[in-house]
Amino acid sequence: MTIGLLATIKVQPGKGPEFEAAFADLAKVVKAEEPGNLQYDLFRAKEADTYVVYEQYADQAALEIHGKSDAGKAGMAKMGSFLAGRPTLQFLDKV
């Protein structure tokens, strides 16, 4: 079953461009190295310093691979330095 994930992310004021660049680097790795990833896109919200990542995975196993990959962990660590708090995650099941 396809799994969707919405991650709402608040970044520190003025750090948006750096966060966007770090996300772009991570997205390239995810799309190249995770065949079970179907979508991994960043959206800038209307609210200042707020982003939403829309992710889709072929199944639970693909989602777990994403959470455990070394490249993913490194990318998340890099982006983490720009965050203003923990992301809010909403998991979705495709109907």
Residue ranges of predicted features:
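Residue-level preference for beta-strand/loop junctions
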Residues: 1-3, 34, 49, 83
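Short hydrophobic/aromatic patches at helix-to-coil boundaries
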Residues: 91-95
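Short, well-ordered beta-strand segments in beta-rich or mixed alpha/beta enzyme
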Residues: 3-10, 39-67
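N-terminal first-folded block
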Residues: 3-33
